[in-house]
């Protein structure tokens, strides 16, 4: 049996899956980061450009400062950033030089482990981004194989991609990313060996300027990781199957940030792995402390706790995650058309096939579900098309894995709006953007202002430094004090218990 490592996802993907990425503030993270640093995790899945935008927009906190502070609080555990290499914060593609600057600043701030995820599996883009990250100083680069079920996403398809990743010197590891929780234990038993076989192939070792005949064969042993969500209840079993099949690391979450649509519960995964004979070098006492902290935080902040999910076979057909499904159902209910929900879900499967089987991760579920809604409610299919759907067919999000249905592509691109979007100017270079922005701002502020509304960045700066201390046990008391302060005629407060007395009077110190 094997020694299995854990990558904790509580701070980013667990937070995003269960709390909409808005649950954790700087203070929440800094309170537990030193403990997480000592648990024995291989890495902490920490942030993305989307999360950085949420820090500014929702919490009015500086995401760059959060990275620096967390790196200082957890210096022994790599912090992980996930991105596509096409965008930064906004969903619009940005200039490559702006991405280079962002990666440079992320490394300087304290990020050392980077995941390259291209939902279209455009390998040219993946390899280009990996080179960019290596030049920026990234210590560990992981390429993502994003799992889905379709006519084109076969074991051979993923194995072929893995072979290209294995041959890239800038990629250190590969992980199977299963964002919808679709990977069954049975499917894992064919997929993982196929991928690992290509990751272990002999490759030609060459210097940068060496001719092929001067190289030597070496065995490439790039490890494989698994990141699988619990959306339909399969992930805990799939993780155990993956460990038996030679996966080096599993991605998990802690306490209230596990289960539901998040990742498997770390404590339960560790116990099950050991039961099967695997070893996991984790400090169980500290792991329990981390889990307890997030459970207490959820209770204090009235945030939902992830619960184990029951198996839902229909999900394998439409692959629409809970959040997008809930939004679609609500939209239909508001229109008095709730009875059409089943028809929309059936149309989702058809639209996805016609668009070349995009993997259902943001923004593609929104594009596919929106188009399905238009098709079901309109007089004819593709009579109405969103700008994002047009941009998708134009290739603005990358090259689709399979060709878009020619008739559908013609219907979408023949409309006047498509011609307008075709004429959109390319992304502005950093030099052009700097000419539009205030002089003498730091690179970090420039990156925020180049990709976010000015008012949001101004509000963040005006809010001042983020709080750095948090205790979930004090939250009810602080809420009580805040509520009492708002009551008219309240001139004093006394808290009295054995061994402790606090008396507050208006205008006095006691």
Where in the sequence are the language-model features?
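Terminal or standalone catalytic/regulatory effector modules within metabolic enzymes
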Residues: 37-38, 43-54, 309-312, 319, ...
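Core active-site phosphate/anionic-ligand binding loop and the adjoining beta-turn-alpha structural block
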Residues: 237, 270-273, 280-337
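Catalytic cores of alpha/beta
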Residues: 157-161, 232-245
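Active-site beta->alpha loop and helix N-cap motifs at the rims of alpha/beta catalytic domains
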Residues: 43, 47-163, 180-183
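N-terminal small/glycine-rich loop or linker at the start of catalytic domains
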Residues: 1-22, 74-91, 108, 138-149, ...
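Conserved, mostly hydrophobic/aromatic
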Residues: 14, 116, 174, 246, ...
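Glycine-rich phosphate-binding active-site loops on the catalytic face of alpha/beta enzymes
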Residues: 245-263
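Alpha-helix-loop-beta-strand connector modules within alpha/beta enzyme cores
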Residues: 57-82, 131-143, 189-208, 213-224, ...
């Amino acid at each position: 049996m094997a020694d299995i490592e854990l990558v904790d996802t509580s701070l980013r993907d667990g937070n995003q899956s269960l709390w909409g990425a808005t649950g954790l503030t700087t203070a929440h993270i800094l309170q537990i980061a030193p403990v997480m640093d000592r648990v024995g995790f291989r890495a902490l899945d920490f942030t993305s450009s989307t999360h950085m935008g949420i820090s500014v927009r929702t919490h009015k906190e500086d995401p760059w400062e959060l990275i620096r502070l967390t790196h200082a609080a957890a210096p022994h555990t790599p912090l992980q950033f996930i991105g596509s290499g096409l965008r930064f914060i906004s969903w619009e593609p940005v200039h490559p030089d702006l991405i280079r600057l962002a990666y440079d600043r992320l490394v300087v701030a304290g990020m050392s482990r980077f995941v390259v995820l291209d939902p279209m599996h455009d390998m040219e883009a993946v390899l280009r981004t990996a080179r960019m990250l290596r030049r920026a100083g990234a210590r560990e680069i992981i390429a993502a194989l994003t799992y889905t079920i379709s006519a084109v996403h076969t074991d051979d398809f993923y194995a072929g991609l893995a072979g290209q990743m294995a041959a890239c010197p800038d990629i250190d590891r590969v992980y199977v990313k299963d964002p919808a929780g679709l990977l069954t234990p049975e499917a894992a038993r064919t997929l993982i060996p196929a991928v690992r076989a290509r990751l272990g192939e002999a490759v030609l070792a060459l210097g940068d300027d060496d001719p092929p005949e001067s190289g030597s064969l070496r065995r490439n042993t790039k490890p494989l990781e698994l990141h699988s969500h619990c959306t339909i209840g399969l992930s805990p079993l799939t993780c155990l199957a993956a460990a038996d099949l030679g996966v080096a690391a599993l991605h998990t979450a802690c306490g209230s940030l596990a289960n539901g649509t998040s990742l498997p519960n770390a404590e339960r995964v560790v116990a099950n792995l050991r039961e099967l004979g695997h070893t996991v070098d984790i400090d169980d006492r500290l792991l329990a402390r981390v889990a307890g902290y997030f459970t207490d935080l959820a209770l204090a902040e009235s945030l939902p706790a992830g619960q184990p999910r029951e198996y839902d076979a229909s999900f394998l057909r439409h692959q629409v995650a809970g959040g997008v499904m809930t939004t679609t159902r609500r939209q239909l209910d508001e229109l008095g058309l709730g009875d059409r929900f089943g028809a929309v879900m059936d149309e989702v499967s058809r639209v996805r096939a016609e668009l070349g089987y995009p993997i259902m991760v943001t923004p593609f579920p929104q594009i596919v579900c929106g188009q399905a809604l238009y098709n079901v409610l309109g007089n004819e299919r593709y009579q109405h098309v969103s700008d994002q759907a047009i941009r998708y067919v134009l290739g603005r999000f990358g090259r689709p894995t399979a060709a878009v249905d020619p008739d559908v592509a013609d219907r979408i691109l023949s409309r006047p709006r498509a011609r307008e979007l075709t004429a959109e100017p390319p992304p502005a270079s950093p030099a052009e953007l700097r000419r539009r922005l205030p002089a003498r701002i730091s690179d970090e502020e420039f990156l925020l202002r180049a990709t976010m509304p000015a008012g949001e960045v101004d509000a963040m700066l005006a809010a001042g430094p983020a709080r750095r201390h948090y205790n979930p046990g004090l939250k009810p008391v602080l809420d009580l004090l805040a509520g009492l302060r708002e009551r008219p005629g309240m001139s004093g407060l006394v808290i009295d218990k054995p061994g402790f007395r606090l008396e507050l009077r208006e205008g006095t110190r006691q």
